Regions:
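Conserved N-terminal phosphate-binding loop of PLP-dependent enzymes in the Aspartate aminotransferase
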Residues: 1-441
Length: 441
């Protein structure tokens, strides 16, 4: 009879992107600051630095006193009410905060359950906008290498070839895709070539396109890849020319992760719709937000399609909104511990710490974008090997495909980042010729 958490988990619970019998490497027994307390199959305890910020969300670390206090206060009042026909202070305060800190013109807010759901709502919003304009446009233009979530609509705008959703191709709407945008260091000729392809595709299909959806300036789970701001700027222009809704998926990039508060602002553009998540609640509870321009909202509201047809049971959950208000306050309002000083400190430490990886023959690139550090190998990552090497160095990492990467919590000191980068370089080095691989999914 299984007794440990790991034994009881095995074959009972599915874990992300894995078979039922994959199980877990560790069970979690506690967490504080940038650390997670883990127990392995032998019962041994480990205290590891969370180099993943729990999939990029726990930016303030674990058991942050401001976050804990916000949730304790709210739960003493009420933990949940339906949002149909009712409102509450945490939701209104959060919406006001988000309108204030995001690029000008994003004046209306929809609070969703998760990042994927916010993308679903954004796609529906774009279709309703076109219907309100008297146009039956239902297709979307997206980028190869994109990742926008695992729900049905979101899957349809993820990379159609190299993505994770090939098994569901027959289920999904057929969308339009541009090649991966040029890298930030691309030549003027390479940028121009991509822009011409974008213009040609829009010229050919503009009458079908309800919206254009992008991860601004950095593609996350589709390959951990930054791209040239001219690509985003051109998509803003093309969306305007054909009156398509430009959707910026800032779920991963928002609140400073790429080195600016929002990647759209760094590129000098304002989307029609912006999706936010992950850092929004500091990883305490699931919540995402969609912000919409007054122009798009007004067109829908004054038409026969005036209701936005989406309403989750846990929409605007008060506990999640309280967490988000505390998180946004820490990220934006605190000049000493906000995102800007944190990312500046982390970025510098990542640059220094990952540089040795470039001496390895099987490393294609070691790249830093704001608070994101990535080592790309010329071969698939061995997940078990990477997990073992990283844990021996005191770090929890979760690599994928050819990438060993980190998005450290914003509370990370240079010493913490140094420990994380040493683990990444050691794990990368262990993939040298002669090793056997368990291919990452």
């Amino acid at each position: 009879m299984p007794t440990s958490t790991l034994e009881r988990d095995s074959g009972l619970l599915w874990h992300p992107y894995g078979p039922l019998d994959a199980g877990a490497h560790f069970s979690v027994t506690g967490a504080d600051g940038p650390y997670v307390e883990l127990r392995d199959a032998s019962g041994s305890a480990h205290r590891l630095l969370d180099g993943m910020s729990s999939w990029w969300s726990v930016v303030h670390g674990y058991q942050h006193p401001v976050m804990d206090a916000a949730l304790t206060t709210q739960i003493g009042s009420f933990s949940h009410v339906m949002f149909g026909g009712l409102t509450h202070e945490p939701a209104v305060e959060l919406a006001e905060r988000l309108v204030a800190v995001t690029p000008d013109g994003l004046d209306h807010v929809f609070l969703a359950d998760s990042g994927s759901v916010s993308v679903e709502v954004a796609l529906k919003l774009a279709v309703q906008y076109q219907l309100a304009r008297g146009r039956d446009r239902r297709r979307f233009l997206a980028l190869e290498g994109a990742y926008h979530g695992d729900t049905t609509g979101a899957m349809s705008v993820c990379d159609p070839v190299g993505g994770m959703h090939n098994d569901f191709a027959g289920l999904l709407a057929t969308q339009l895709f541009l090649p991966r945008p040029p890298l930030p260091e691309a030549s003027a000729a390479e940028v121009h070539e991509w822009l011409v392809k974008a213009e040609n595709l829009v010229d050919a299909h503009g009458a079908e396109i309800a919206g254009i959806i992008v991860e601004p300036l950095f593609q996350g789970a589709g390959g951990m890849r930054p791209y040239h701001p001219a690509a985003l700027q051109s998509l803003r222009r093309l969306a305007t020319e054909i009156d398509a809704v430009l959707i910026a998926d800032e779920i991963a990039t928002g609140f400073g992760r790429t080195g600016s508060d929002f990647a759209c602002r760094a590129a000098g553009i304002t989307p029609d719709v912006m999706c936010l998540g992950k850092a929004l609640t500091g990883g305490y509870l699931t919540l995402a937000a969609l912000l919409c321009s007054g122009t798009v909202a007004d067109v829908i509201t004054t038409s026969s399609h005036r209701a936005l047809m989406h309403g989750p049971t846990f929409m605007a959950n008060p506990l999640a909104c309280a967490a988000a208000n505390a998180s946004v306050g820490l990220l934006i309002d605190d000049e000493t511990s906000g995102w800007a000083p944190a990312i500046g400190r982390i970025s510098q430490a990542l640059e220094t710490g990952l540089a040795p990886a470039m001496r390895l023959d099987h490393v294609i690139e070691a790249r830093v974008t704001g608070g994101i550090g990535v080592v790309e190998l010329d071969r698939p990552v061995d997940v078990a090997l990477t997990t073992r090497i990283a844990s021996e160095h005191g770090v929890w990492l979760r690599p994928f495909r050819q990438h060993i990467y980190t998005m450290p919590p914003y509370i990370s000191t240079p010493a913490v980042v140094d420990t994380i980068t040493k683990a990444i370089v050691a794990a990368a080095a262990a993939h040298g010729d002669g090793c056997e691989f368990e291919v990452a999914s």
